[in-house]
């Protein structure tokens, strides 16, 4: 037996070195019939120590030692296991997996798992994964020992306390099974696999998809373009026509603001789309108009059924669902009414249908109050088509009957106050020749929005379009010329007059501290243009097109006169800069012969119009109610420089405060008292302002029911602060025509006065005035 064979068959873990030294090799001469096994027997008192050490060696995670079957059989034949070893093995088994004791020691369990993992033979090739024969030990006694360890391991795994080992074993068994089976099986595909690509759409689905996309993009700006695409979408059958009309109807009723646009679309489609034969023999042909009106009728008649279904949702858990459905039913009802009214304007709905709708909403019994939903719908209906009905003499007679019924509803106590005021608004609208007090919300084109912005901001026509597109007008609408400038260049936008950050160009009106435009005084001495020109401006070539320059700068470039620069006289010192001088290389400027400057007579600044003053007043008042700075508001009002307009300021302040609500009453009174104490406002300004507001109270109280009460509180507190005289109360009440509003103002004022001792003293000293006010209330 060679030395290499001795190293291979060594029972010591690691195969060489350690306990026994070279002695172990001499005691196991495989090939000899007998041998000495004294090292396995206990020697003296070293029995327990040796056993412990042997147990430790069995569980140490050292390198595995492989033995052939023949070697193990030879060992089985020549080795006789001593009783001490068997007893030690039995003690270890009882300690590790006793009959009654649970596995509590985690360390021992980990050691057992480690032992089992390293005790099993692992002959798998993990790289090539080729099946190899597994060597199995053939020792009978040892097989029982390993079986016990394996059973203990399986029972511990089943308890679920070491899932990580379970996962590792499962993974190992999975790899083993795959290695034994051979190649991996093919993937099983689903019968209907998921795919990014959509299935083939039918012609109807394709058309409806196209129509939905067109309706989602429909705006007044793109109306003509998208209308043509909708006509060419492929509406070739009656079923497609009905579904397209349903899509348009749903969009219209859920977007009431765009109902005029959808009504115009329906009118055009009715003219362009073909009609189809009836599906029933002898029936009428299917047209766009007939299908659309059927949808409107079904929605109108089915509203009551929808409300009855909503009323059945009475459970506490159905509260949110009930509210959502109520809102949806209300939106669809009002949208349907609005659409029918707009279709009447397009002559697609006959007037007899309109009268039928009105009679259904008002009810047949004149002494019975209609439902709140019907009252709101009829008010919306008359806001839309009232003017068209009044233009027809025959329909006007019916309108008189309808509006008499509405007038009765304004005094019906069974109706909510919101709806009573809504009916009163419709009556006022008719009495005002159908001219609304406020502009109606409707869809507008971008050009219309820009035009309104230019009018409100005082900009030149086309300024907003130039800012949006980043180019200025060149006359031909083409690209910018080499001499033109782009709006995207830094600092160019700031040169536009009236824009934020605008530069002060020659002759351009200045801006005050509050960003209001203030004309320059003509008596202000003008500086030398040569000194004012910076080197970059004097040497830089300028564009030849003077239209591209800001207002007021044309005179500086071309020498022409401008109304903004002066009264048409030449520039001081006779300096004239021509385009040829600016486009060529820089030359020394030679001034013209000096001429004595013309002394201009100081001219008074033009007086601002009432419209400008009103805009400024509303702006400063809104700013005050936002920041609540008295001194800032005082400065802004003084900068108006129009004491005659102060009563209007008082009226606008009261109007804005009462429109905002009760939280703005205290800031309003602080402002008026502050301006009165600072001698900015006089007593006559406050009195006149209150009279102006009281003359508007009859109309304002329709939208602001609490306005009379709050106005009475304002008057009472102004009287208490001695800013207002008690004599003005009678004149204020005379300006109010409605007796109900008049009584509300007087009662609120008296309540404030009586709650204060000084107010009681004022009332006691002006008994005659109070009696006169009381007579105004009793005379009605």
Curated annotation (Swiss-Prot):
Classification via Gene3D superfamilies: 1.25.40.180
GO cellular component: eukaryotic translation initiation factor 4F complex
UniProt entry keywords in alphabetical sequence: Initiation factor, Protein biosynthesis, Translation regulation
Domain MIF4G stretches: 208-432
Top-rank lineage group of the source organism: Eukaryota
Record's compositionally biased regions (Basic and acidic residues): 517-529
GO aspect biological process, one term: translational initiation
UniProt-recorded Gene Ontology molecular function terms: mRNA binding; translation initiation factor activity
Ranges where the MI domain occurs: 612-734
PROSITE patterns: MI
Subunit structure: EIF4F is a multi-subunit complex, the composition of which varies with external and internal environmental conditions. It is composed of at least EIF4A, EIF4E and EIF4G. In higher plants two isoforms of EIF4F have been identified, named isoform EIF4F and isoform EIF(iso)4F. Isoform EIF4F has subunits p220 and p26, whereas isoform EIF(iso)4F has subunits p82 and p28.
PANTHER family per UniProt: EUKARYOTIC TRANSLATION INITIATION FACTOR 4 GAMMA (PTHR23253), EUKARYOTIC TRANSLATION INITIATION FACTOR ISOFORM 4G-1 (PTHR23253:SF53)
Annotated protein name in UniProt: Eukaryotic translation initiation factor isoform 4G-2
Protein species of origin: Oryza sativa subsp. japonica
């Amino acid at each position: 037996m060679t030395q290499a064979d001795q190293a291979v068959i060594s029972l010591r873990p690691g195969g060489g070195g350690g306990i026994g030294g070279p002695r172990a090799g001499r005691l196991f001469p495989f090939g000899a019939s007998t041998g000495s096994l004294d090292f396995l027997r206990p020697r003296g008192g070293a029995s327990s120590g040796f056993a412990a050490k042997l147990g430790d060696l069995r569980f140490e995670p050292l390198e595995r030692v492989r033995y052939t079957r023949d070697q193990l059989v030879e060992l089985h034949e020549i080795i006789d296991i001593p009783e001490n070893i068997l007893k030690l093995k039995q003690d270890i088994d009882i300690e590790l997996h006793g009959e009654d004791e649970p596995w509590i020691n985690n360390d021992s369990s980990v050691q057992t798992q480690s032992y089992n993992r390293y005790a099993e033979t692992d002959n798998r090739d993990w790289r090539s994964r080729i099946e190899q024969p597994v060597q199995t030990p053939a020792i009978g006694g040892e097989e029982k020992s390993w079986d016990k360890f394996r059973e203990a391991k399986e029972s511990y795994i089943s308890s679920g306390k070491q899932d990580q080992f379970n996962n590792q074993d499962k993974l190992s068994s999975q790899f083993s099974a795959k290695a034994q089976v051979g190649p991996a099986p093919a993937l099983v595909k689903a019968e209907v696999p998921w795919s990014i690509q959509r299935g083939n759409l039918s012609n109807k689905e394709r058309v409806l998809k196209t129509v939905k996309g067109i309706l989602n993009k429909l705006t007044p700006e793109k109306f003509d373009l998208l209308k043509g695409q909708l006509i060419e979408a492929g509406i070739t059958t009656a079923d497609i026509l009905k579904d397209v009309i349903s899509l348009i109807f749903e969009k219209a009723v859920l977007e009431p603001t765009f109902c005029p646009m959808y009504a115009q679309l329906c009118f055009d489609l009715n003219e362009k789309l073909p009609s189809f034969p009836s599906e029933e023999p002898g029936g009428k042909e299917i047209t766009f108009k007939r299908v659309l009106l059927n949808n409107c009728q079904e929605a109108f008649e089915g509203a009551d059924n929808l409300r009855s279904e909503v009323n059945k949702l009475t459970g506490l858990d159905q509260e949110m669902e009930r509210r959502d459905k109520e809102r949806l039913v209300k939106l669809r009802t009002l949208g349907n009414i609005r659409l029918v009214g707009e279709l009447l304007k397009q002559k697609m709905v006959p007037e007899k249908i309109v009268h039928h709708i009105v009679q259904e909403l008002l009810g047949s019994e004149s002494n019975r109050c209609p439902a709140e939903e019907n009252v709101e719908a009829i008010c919306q209906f008359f806001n839309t088509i009232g003017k068209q009905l009044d233009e027809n003499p025959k329909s006007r007679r019916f309108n008189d009957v309808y509006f008499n019924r509405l007038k009765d509803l304004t005094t019906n106590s069974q109706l909510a106050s919101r709806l009573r005021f809504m009916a009163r608004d419709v009556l006022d609208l008719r009495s005002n020749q159908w001219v609304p007090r406020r502009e109606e919300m409707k869809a507008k084109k971008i050009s219309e929005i820009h035009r309104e912005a230019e009018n409100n901001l005082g900009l030149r026509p086309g300024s907003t379009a130039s800012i949006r597109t980043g180019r200025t007008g060149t006359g031909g609408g083409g690209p910018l010329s080499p001499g033109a400038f782009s709006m995207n260049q830094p600092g160019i936008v700031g040169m536009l007059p009236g824009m934020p950050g605008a530069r002060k160009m020659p002759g351009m009106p200045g801006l005050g501290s509050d960003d209001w435009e203030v004309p320059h005084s003509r008596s202000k001495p003008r500086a030398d243009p040569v000194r004012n020109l910076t080197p970059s401006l004097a040497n830089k070539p300028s564009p030849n097109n003077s239209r591209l320059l800001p207002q007021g700068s044309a005179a500086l470039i071309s020498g022409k006169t401008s109304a903004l620069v002066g009264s048409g006289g030449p520039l001081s010192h006779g300096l004239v800069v021509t385009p040829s001088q600016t486009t060529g290389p820089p030359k020394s400027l030679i001034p013209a012969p000096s001429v004595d400057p013309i002394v201009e007579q100081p001219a008074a600044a033009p007086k601002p119009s009432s419209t400008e003053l009103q805009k400024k007043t509303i702006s400063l008042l809104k700013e005050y109610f936002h920041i609540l700075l008295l001194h800032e508001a005082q400065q802004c009002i003084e900068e108006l420089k129009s004491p005659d307009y102060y009563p209007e300021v008082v009226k606008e302040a009261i109007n804005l405060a009462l429109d905002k609500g009760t939280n703005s009453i205290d800031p309003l009174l602080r402002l008026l008292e502050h301006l009165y104490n600072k001698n900015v406002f006089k007593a006559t300004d406050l009195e006149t302002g209150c009279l102006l507001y009281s003359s508007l109270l009859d109309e304002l109280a329709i939208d602001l029911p609490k306005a009379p009460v709050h106005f009475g509180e304002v008057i009472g507190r102004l009287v208490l602060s001695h800013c207002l005289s008690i004599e003005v109360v009678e004149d204020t009440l005379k300006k109010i025509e409605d007796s109900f509003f008049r009584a509300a103002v007087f009662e609120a004022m008296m309540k404030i006065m009586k709650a204060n001792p000084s107010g009681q003293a004022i009332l006691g000293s002006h008994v005659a005035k109070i009696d006169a006010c009381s007579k105004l209330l009793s005379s009605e």
